[in-house]
């Protein structure tokens, strides 16, 4: 009999959180778990998950059950509950929880900071005294909770590497863009930044650039020369997004879910980290860069300064041109370390099995 897992998620201002939860849900389902996802705005899920129906408060998609947690009816709760990113589980659900539920996992946001290893898998306050609740801390070390390495995506990365031109021409067929070896392709999915200054710097370069803009908030109301082509792309679902970041030579990327997909391409990227008060986001960025440092044989200081200036909205165009003019194996090397040592799903399921089997023996 399949073990059951319920995942809870809020959609707040962007779709990164539900993107993480859906990707996790798919991997759990593929490993023979019965998966249900409860989300506060089910009508918006269809924007990133192709095939979901925005008009239904309940549906099954690719084997996973989706519920609107403002409007659902269930008879039982799962053996394992995962609450993502401090979401509040509805009282109507908690009222049904009984001893059949073995474990509640508080899935936190990704971090490279050292302190997360001390909190990973430590007890958290549980709404039910007879159910264990723990913190689960995703991260970039073997002692952390790891990151989501879904097999579909890793296979896609390899497939596009082998047949990039074919994928490229098919994906951009409607736009009439054909792959060219003398063009540098850049994907832009960021929060607001000084985009005009960056373009002005690119114009001074001998490179030919094509930019794919995935952020509709960027101001494109300025002129640029013929050797720079800019395409404002329509909103993309998760599968389309996975393809375009692998087709690009460089990714400007924001958030957690998109950042991890960019990291797993093995290609260069700059992470636009979510801004926090008192510059806490810069501390988090510095922590990640420090993890990344050992994979650079050269140019670490250049990349470090690029990352900071990008996130502080300083002009970094000349440094960017200097960086991309050189070849870097560091991104592929770091990807290999992550794939080998930081598989979140494997770590999570190992922990779940150890805890639920222990609870069963105690019963």
Language model region names:
Residues 10, 15, 22-25, 235-284:
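A donor-sugar binding/catalytic signature common to diverse glycosyltransferases
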Residues 338-363:
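C-terminal alpha-helical cap of glycosyltransferases
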Residues 254-335:
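Catalytic binding pocket for nucleotide-activated donors in carbohydrate/polymer assembly enzymes
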Residues 99-103, 207, 267:
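A short helix->loop->beta-strand "cap" motif at the edges of active sites that frequently abuts
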Residues 4, 79-80, 103, 185, ...:
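Structural motif
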Residues 204-234:
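Catalytic donor nucleotide-activated moiety binding site of glycosyltransferases and closely related
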Residues 8-31, 36-130:
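Active-site and donor-binding regions of nucleotide-sugar-utilizing enzymes
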Residues 108-195:
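A nucleotide-sugar donor-handling region in carbohydrate enzymes
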């Amino acid at each position: 009999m399949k073990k059951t897992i319920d995942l809870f998620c809020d959609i707040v201002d962007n779709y990164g959180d539900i993107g993480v939860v859906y990707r996790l849900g798919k991997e759990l389902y593929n490993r023979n778990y019965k998966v249900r996802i409860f989300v506060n705005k089910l009508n918006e899920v269809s924007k990133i998950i192709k095939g979901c129906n925005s008009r239904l408060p309940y549906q099954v998609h690719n084997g996973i059950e989706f519920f609107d947690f403002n409007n659902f009816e269930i008879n039982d709760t799962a053996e394992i509950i995962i609450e993502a990113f401090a979401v509040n589980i509805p009282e109507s659900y908690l009222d049904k929880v009984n001893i059949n539920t073995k474990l509640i996992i508080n899935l936190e946001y990704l971090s490279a900071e050292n302190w997360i290893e001390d909190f990973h898998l430590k007890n958290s306050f549980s709404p039910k005294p007879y159910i264990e609740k723990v913190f689960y801390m995703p991260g970039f070390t073997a002692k952390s909770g790891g990151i989501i390495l879904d097999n579909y995506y890793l296979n896609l990365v390899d497939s596009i590497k082998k047949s990039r031109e074919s994928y490229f021409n098919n994906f951009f067929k409607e736009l009439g863009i054909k792959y060219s070896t003398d063009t540098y392709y850049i994907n832009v999915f960021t929060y607001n930044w000084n985009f005009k200054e960056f373009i002005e710097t690119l114009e001074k370069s001998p490179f030919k650039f094509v930019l794919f803009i995935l952020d509709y908030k960027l101001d494109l109301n300025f002129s640029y020369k013929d050797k720079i082509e800019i395409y404002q792309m329509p909103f993309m679902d998760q599968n389309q997004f996975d393809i375009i970041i692998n087709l690009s030579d460089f990714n400007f990327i924001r958030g957690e879910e998109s950042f991890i997909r960019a990291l797993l391409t093995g290609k260069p990227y700059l992470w636009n980290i979510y801004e926090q008060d008192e510059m806490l986001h810069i501390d988090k960025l510095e922590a990640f860069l420090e993890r990344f440092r050992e994979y650079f044989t050269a140019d670490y200081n250049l990349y470090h300064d690029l990352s900071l200036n990008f996130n502080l909205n300083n002009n970094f165009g000349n440094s960017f041109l200097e960086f991309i003019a050189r070849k870097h194996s560091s991104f592929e090397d770091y990807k290999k370390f992550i794939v080998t040592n930081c598989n979140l799903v494997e770590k999570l399921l190992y922990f779940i099995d150890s805890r639920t089997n222990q609870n069963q023996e105690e019963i």
